[in-house]
């Protein structure tokens, strides 16, 4: 069986051939594979599972382009199914041709469709749903008919009033025009096509008659009658221009599609019916709107002037004083202001026209009627952008719409203090999974008055979206509503800030709105999660509601096996918002900078950022190297949304979630190690095999085959302490190494693979450095460990009681041959001379399911005890199913030393001993040993000895055997390692040096002390030691202060700042612009030993946990 070659067409043919019951052509299957990468992977895995079938071999063993089915015009399905090739013809093929006489094609004329039945459904003037023929009729109204109606309406109105007097009409005349224009707008019965499409005519009431305009004498009489109450008349007139008919919609279980919008940016369910705003054509609307606006302003100014004159007369104030008081009150904070800022403040100018490509704020208003509880949750399908607006900006070259902000305002009706709760949930309408579709929710009590919520979804969708009527899906529900079913619960308004963008356009959100999204505060509101909820301060109902929204079920297609699907009925979902996850009530007078904004994202499982595969051999043995995945390459190669966000942000400090999907199998006994190597410290030590001392010295996680799919989180800010750039850098390269810790006892049937998924939410980091991983202090060790795992311990299958030990000299540096492997745990323990207390840890039995053992864990000093009567008197513990244990360290000194002396062994001191009380046992034929892995978590109530070194100098490095008199030692802004070709270098070993080795970056100030001894007599020596501080490099750098010490002085003191322009310096030599120091010797051969000592000042910080093999 040779190599298989895959292509989308071959996979589509395979899927179509295996599923004839599902139907569909090869091209349809090919389209599904081209658009769905996960489906393609599923089909590919099915082919790999059936690669021994002859059909699979005939389809996939050919190189792409040479197979029997690669050419869609000449598919040799006979060969694929039977393996038989057609026999070669024995005579010319021309003899087998059959000449067909062309026939005239018969044209079939289809019969006309039957006429539709008479439509007798009663439709109100402003029903929440409109019939199809009504909508079609309204849309077919031509521009000429609109203009003629507008001209007829204006002909009935006076064209101008002298001296800017406001327009005054009788109420009868206004209502006549209202009824007439509303009827003509929505029900144009003059269209003869209605009668043709619906025999008998539409079932509509007759239009109201148009009243003739009154004579001049009647107008004068009406004006004189109303002059006595001019203020009330002016108020009525102003309200008449805005008067809207509001329908009470009884829709507790009705889906309402609001798919179009005309003047407000989106069609309302309860449509405002102002004739002066709706019965105009697009050509005359701007001038007429200005005409109406001027008259409204004049009317308001006159009304205000009358009110101020009355106020001044009643309070003995001047007119100016009354006006100042009125304006001062108007500048105060208004109750119920919208949270959405004005458009001019929300978007920066873009393009040559110096204006944002966006439209109005409010796009949906409706009245909630009935009790939306239980399964009667109100569902509203809502498109925030009208069709006209889409067409307008499509002509300008825009291709997408971005919903930057969405506001929900709930204005409840009823008695104050009513504890009835009401919740509105906003979701993305084209996403079936509620956890992914959720945008935000707002909950309030009806008795608490107006409440507002604002969300920043950043939702972007194409203008070519075929189902634009359901972009936003709103769910409205209550858990304890008790009002009458015909009562109006609340008025709910939904508004958006949006913009239209093209393929070459950036989003142009103003800095104030961007700051509101980042900091989570806007217009005296508090951000909690990704929702801003504002409720009045001092409400009658205390606390916050606990919402429960029932979302109805439906049918769907579900995969039940490889290339197999079935249609199922899904039950409804319950979407609950607990009170602790909502915004709290706030005082509107609180100063916002004093409020602490919660992070917008509280979880990292948002979307897939990267994906990789680890291949595992069928005979995977211990210490086998399986592969390496570069986290940066996983994200960049995946090219998903997170990678685009990463490119935009540049620097990120994410929390990765790793999910390793593998089939569970308890018969192999396999255990792997996933090692996080952020600084390439162990990469070179891993080839075809990997010693566990290397892989367990860096942050790592154990993966057990018997448990199946594994997941963990990698907090990059916690483990590395610095941000991550979207392109590769010289000082860090985060990788995941996969190695086998304990091999499988049974060889599997074939090699296999595990899929590694990387989830993250990549948001911009505000700085390069985060919280330090460690801050140096002589007493930094507190008894807690992280990632402390001992190499595997193996028990032989024997009847003799076995004993295995794990040493407790945890400050000892592990070794692989002659290589020391510095890790942070041993560096921390080496800060003290010894320790005592109770060790808490866990034992992992990594054997197959048919192995078993009974383990007794005990601590002993200087050897082992094989006397059972004495052994069971020691404080110990049996290893239970979860493997956890707590054992007190036994020592005649109450402590055990942190490190060993030369010639000593682990058993000479305190150790953890594991006795196989019973077992191990296994079925006949098994010869492999039983492995266990021990992890130590902490020392409970530690009894720590004296510090190894208190506040004193550490030996850094010794220079000796100089070969040149003119010697210059360049000491960069790093500490741990140093080499030279002109002298001998010996590095000092101490806890501080080990901490430098076990971190990727470090920064702080070191006090340095230089000491040297001479080869010649003291009186005959000459020369000097010069210490110079510099910045940059030798060629273009800066020279700083310098100190010169006579060689007879034998010592000198200085300091060195460890760090670079970024703040912390990696363990590399002159890699970044930083400070460094040069030590110049003019008589180096006369110096026997030059010793440099260092003492870190308080606050010396380390970033990025790792290890250092040397």
UniProtKB/Swiss-Prot annotation:
GO cellular component terms given for this protein: host cell cytoplasm; host cell nucleus; host cell plasmodesma; viral capsid
InterPro entries in the cross-refs: Nepo_coat, Nepo_coat_C, Nepo_coat_N, Nepovirus_subgr_A_2A, Viral_coat
Protein name as it appears in the record: RNA2 polyprotein
GO biological process, any: transport of virus in host, cell to cell
Coiled coil: none
Organism, as annotated: Grapevine fanleaf virus (isolate NW)
UniProt keyword annotation of Nucleus present: no
Similarity remark: Belongs to the nepoviruses RNA2 polyprotein family.
């Amino acid at each position: 069986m040779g190599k298989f070659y895959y292509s989308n067409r071959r996979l589509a043919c395979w899927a179509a051939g295996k599923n004839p019951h599902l139907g569909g052509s090869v091209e349809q299957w090919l389209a599904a594979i081209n658009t769905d990468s996960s489906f393609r992977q599923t089909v590919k895995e099915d082919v790999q599972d059936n690669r021994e079938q002859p059909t699979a071999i005939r389809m996939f063993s050919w190189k792409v382009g040479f197979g029997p089915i690669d050419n869609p015009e000449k598919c040799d399905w006979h060969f694929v199914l039977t393996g038989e090739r057609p026999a070669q013809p024995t005579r010319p093929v021309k003899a087998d041709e059959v000449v067909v006489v062309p026939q005239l094609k018969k044209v079939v004329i289809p019969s006309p469709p039957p006429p539709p039945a008479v439509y007798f459904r009663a439709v109100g003037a402003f029903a929440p749903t409109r019939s199809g023929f009504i909508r079609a009729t309204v849309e077919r109204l031509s521009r000429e008919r609109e203009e003629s109606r507008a001209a007829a309406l204006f002909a009935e109105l006076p064209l101008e009033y002298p001296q800017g007097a406001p327009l005054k009409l009788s109420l009868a005349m206004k209502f006549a025009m209202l009824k007439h224009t509303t009827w003509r707008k929505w029900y144009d019965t003059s269209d003869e096509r209605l009668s043709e499409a619906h025999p008998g005519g539409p079932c509509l009431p007759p239009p109201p008659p148009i009243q003739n305009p009154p004579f001049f004498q009647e107008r004068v009489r009406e004006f004189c009658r109303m002059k006595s109450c001019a203020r009330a008349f002016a108020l009525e007139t102003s309200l008449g221009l805005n008067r809207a008919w509001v329908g009470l919609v009884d829709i507790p279980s009705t889906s309402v599609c609001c798919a179009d919008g005309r003047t407000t940016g989106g069609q309302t369910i309860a449509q405002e019916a102002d004739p002066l705003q709706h019965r105009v054509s697009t050509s005359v609307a701007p001038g007429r709107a200005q005409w109406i606006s001027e008259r409204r302003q004049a009317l308001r100014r006159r009304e205000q002037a009358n009110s101020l004159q009355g106020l001044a007369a009643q309070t003995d104030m001047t007119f100016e004083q009354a006006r100042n008081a009125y304006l001062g009150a108007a500048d105060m904070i208004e109750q119920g202001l919208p949270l959405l800022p004005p458009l001019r403040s929300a978007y920066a100018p873009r393009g040559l026209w110096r204006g944002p490509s966006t439209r109005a704020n409010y796009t949906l208003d409706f009245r909630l009627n009935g009790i939306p509880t239980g399964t009667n949750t109100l569902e509203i399908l809502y498109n925030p952008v009208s069709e006209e607006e889409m067409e307008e900006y499509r002509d300008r070259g825009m291709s997408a719409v971005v919903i930057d902000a969405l506001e929900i305002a709930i204005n409840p009706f009823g008695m104050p203090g009513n504890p009835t709760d009401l919740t509105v949930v906003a979701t993305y309408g084209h996403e079936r999974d509620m956890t992914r579709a959720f945008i935000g929710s707002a909950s309030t009590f009806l008795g608490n008055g107006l409440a507002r919520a604002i969300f920043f979804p950043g939702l972007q969708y194409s203008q070519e979206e075929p189902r634009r009527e359901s972009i936003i899906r709103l769910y409205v529900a209550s858990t304890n509503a008790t009002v009458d079913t015909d009562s109006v619960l609340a008025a709910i308004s939904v508004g958006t800030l949006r913009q239209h963008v093209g393929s070459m356009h950036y989003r142009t959100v103003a800095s104030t709105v961007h700051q509101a999204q980042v900091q989570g505060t806007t217009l005296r509101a508090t951000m909690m999660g990704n929702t801003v909820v504002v409720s009045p301060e001092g409400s009658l109902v205390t606390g916050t509601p606990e919402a429960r929204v029932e979302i109805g079920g439906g049918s769907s297609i579900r995969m039940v096996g490889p290339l197999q699907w079935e249609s199922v009925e899904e039950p409804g979902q319950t979407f609950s918002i607990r009170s602790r996850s909502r915004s709290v009530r706030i005082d509107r007078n609180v100063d916002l900078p004093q409020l602490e904004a919660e992070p917008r994202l509280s979880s990292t499982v948002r979307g897939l950022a990267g994906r990789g595969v680890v291949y595992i051999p069928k005979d995977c043995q211990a210490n086998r190297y399986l592969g390496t995945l570069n986290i940066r390459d996983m994200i960049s190669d995946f090219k998903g949304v997170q990678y685009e966000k990463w490119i935009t942000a540049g620097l990120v400090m994410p929390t990765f979630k790793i999910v390793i999907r593998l089939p569970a199998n308890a018969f192999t006994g396999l255990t792997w190690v996933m090692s996080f190597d952020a600084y390439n410290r162990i990469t070179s030590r891993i080839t075809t095999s990997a010693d566990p001392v290397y892989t367990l010295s860096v942050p790592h996680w154990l993966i057990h085959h018997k448990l199946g799919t594994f997941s963990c989180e990698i907090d990059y800010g916690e483990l590395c302490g610095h941000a991550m750039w979207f392109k590769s850098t010289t000082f860090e390269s985060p990788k995941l190494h996969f190695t086998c810790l304990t091999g499988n006892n049974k060889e599997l049937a074939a090699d296999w693979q595990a899929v590694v998924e990387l989830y993250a939410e990549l948001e911009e980091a505000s700085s390069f450095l985060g919280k330090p991983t460690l801050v140096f202090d002589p007493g930094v060790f507190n008894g807690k460990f992280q990632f402390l795992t001992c190499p595997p311990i193996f028990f032989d299958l024997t009847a003799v009681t076995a004993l295995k030990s794990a040493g407790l000299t945890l400050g000892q540096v592990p070794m692989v041959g002659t290589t020391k492997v510095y890790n942070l745990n041993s560096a921390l323990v080496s800060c003290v001379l010894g320790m005592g207390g109770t060790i808490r840890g866990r034992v992992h039995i990594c054997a197959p399911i048919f192995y078993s053992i009974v383990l007794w864990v005990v601590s002993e000093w200087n050897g082992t005890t094989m006397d059972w009567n004495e052994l069971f008197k020691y404080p110990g513990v049996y290893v239970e199913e979860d493997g956890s244990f707590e054992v007190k360290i036994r020592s005649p000194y109450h402590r055990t030393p942190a490190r060993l002396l030369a010639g000593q062994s682990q058993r000479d001191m305190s150790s953890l001993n594991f006795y196989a009380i019973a077992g191990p046992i296994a079925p006949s034929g098994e010869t492999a040993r039983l492995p266990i892995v021990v992890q130590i978590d902490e020392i409970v109530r530690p009894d720590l000895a004296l510090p190894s070194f208190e506040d004193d100098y550490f030996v850094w490095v010794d220079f000796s055997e100089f070969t040149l008199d003119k010697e210059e030692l360049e000491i960069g802004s790093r500490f741990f390692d140093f080499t030279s070709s002109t002298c001998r270098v010996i590095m000092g070993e101490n806890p501080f040096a080990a901490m430098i080795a076990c971190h990727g970056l470090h920064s702080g100030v070191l006090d340095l002390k230089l000491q040297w001894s001479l080869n010649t007599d003291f009186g005959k020596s000459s020369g000097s030691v010069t210490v110079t501080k510099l910045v940059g490099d030798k060629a273009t750098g800066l020279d700083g202060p310098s100190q010169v010490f006579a060689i007879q002085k034998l010592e000198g003191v200085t300091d060195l700042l460890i760090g670079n322009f970024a703040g912390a310096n990696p363990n590399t030599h002159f890699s970044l612009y930083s400070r460094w120091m040069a030590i110049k010797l003019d008589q180096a051969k006369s110096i026997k030993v030059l010793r440099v000592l260092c003492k870190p000042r308080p606050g010396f910080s380390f970033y990025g946990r790792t290890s250092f093999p040397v």
